[in-house]
């Protein structure tokens, strides 16, 4: 496939024939691909793999048609796999010619691999704010930025611990809804 629209057109013309790799059944890639299918109006078959490298090898070998993967794989397997879209809300600086999913015509909520820092419940709000400020400062150090770029990561901090809690709630809500609709979790 040369583009997301080609992939979607193929899937719609050949119902049930598109297969896509997932890192474990019910993982983030599986849930996001299920959400994308619902929004774009096609249905494919999830093929589970033990991890990203196995899935990339499945794409290269033609065992699967596509797979949602972290950016490091696009960078590592350059020339062997074709990135079709960035799932985030903006193009990725390391692959500037690859459009976002929205630019490709699928208006799915943006997605990214993300993580966060947590502290014990009941942590003094002043201490939480100080930790957040320290993380913001460290995240701008040139050595930290260089390390993240070298491993195909971007760092975007929320502005406050409260915003991070809201992100957690939002992510859990869509994952629960998609997982339940796909029969991956009990309703």
Which role does the model predict for each range below?
Residues 49, 68-69, 86:
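Short beta-strand and adjacent tight-turn residues that come in two discontinuous sequence segments
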Residues 16-19, 38-50, 54-65, 152-158, ...:
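A local structural motif
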Residues 34-39, 53-67, 72-80, 169:
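Short helices/loops that flank or line small-molecule/ion binding pockets
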Residues 32-34, 57, 95-99, 159:
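Short, well-ordered secondary-structure micro-motifs
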């Amino acid at each position: 496939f040369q583009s997301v629209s080609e992939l979607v057109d193929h899937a719609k013309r050949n119902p049930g024939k598109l297969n896509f790799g997932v890192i474990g059944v019910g993982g983030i890639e599986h849930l996001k691909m299920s959400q994308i299918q619902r929004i774009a109006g096609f249905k494919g078959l999830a093929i589970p793999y033990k991890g990203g490298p196995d899935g990339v090898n499945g794409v290269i070998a033609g065992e699967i048609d596509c797979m949602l993967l972290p950016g490091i794989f696009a960078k590592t397997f350059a020339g062997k796999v074709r990135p079709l879209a960035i799932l985030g809300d903006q193009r990725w600086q390391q692959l500037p010619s690859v459009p976002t999913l929205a630019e490709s015509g699928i208006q799915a909520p943006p997605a990214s691999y993300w993580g966060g820092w947590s502290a014990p419940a009941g942590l003094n709000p002043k201490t939480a704010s100080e930790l957040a400020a320290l993380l913001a400062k460290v995240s701008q150090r040139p050595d930290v930025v260089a390390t993240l770029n070298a491993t195909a990561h971007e760092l975007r901090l929320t502005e406050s611990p409260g915003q991070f809690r809201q992100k957690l709630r939002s992510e859990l809500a869509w994952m629960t809804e998609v997982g339940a609709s796909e029969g991956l979790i009990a309703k």
